Amino acid sequence: MQPALLDTSVYITALRAGSDALGTLRRLAPQAPLWLSAVVLEELYAGISRRDRRVVERLERDFERAQRILVPNLNDWSQAGQVLARLAAEYDYEEIGRGRLTNDARIAMSAGRQGIVVITANQRDFAKIARFRNFRFELTAV
């Protein structure tokens, strides 16, 4: 079974749904080894409420113990920049448009390198990135 990671959009939806929602996320990839992107972790910490902080801390601890935290390497950063430049040219993005896609590009580059499928609710951005970098993503409505 191909490994998977959940995008920030999936975790945020689950956190908003309530305390038990994170436990049900496993059903999105029941047989797949799950990974946590360091980029997703950063986004979660940056945007969570005090109430949800312990949930995210537990996620970090559990994935770190399992040695399944995916950290972008130098090549991922370089490829993300190249993809963002191509997206800017293709879609006439200004700096804000590119900035919005930066984290998603790093997630896509690192997941693609490791053969990990990204499970997301954000079709718009990941579909654009996929035009310029081969990686797998699947949509979910959570």
What do the predicted segments below correspond to?
Residues 69-117, 121:
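Active-site neighborhoods of divalent-metal-dependent phosphate/nucleic-acid chemistry enzymes
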Residues 3, 108-142:
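Acidic, PIN/NYN-like endoribonuclease modules and their adjacent C-terminal/linker elements
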Residues 35, 70, 138-140:
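General small-molecule cofactor/ligand-binding pocket signal
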Residues 14, 43, 79, 128:
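Phosphate- and divalent-cation-binding pockets in alpha/beta enzyme and binding domains
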Residues 10-11, 40, 76, 107, ...:
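Alpha-helix capping/helix-boundary segments
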Residues 51-55, 87-88, 136-139:
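Short, hinge-like loop/turn segments at secondary-structure boundaries
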Residues 7-8, 44, 80, 111:
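Generic structural signal for small/hydrophobic residues in well-ordered secondary structure
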Residues 1-36, 40, 46-64:
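Short, well-structured N-terminal submotif of metal-dependent ribonuclease cores
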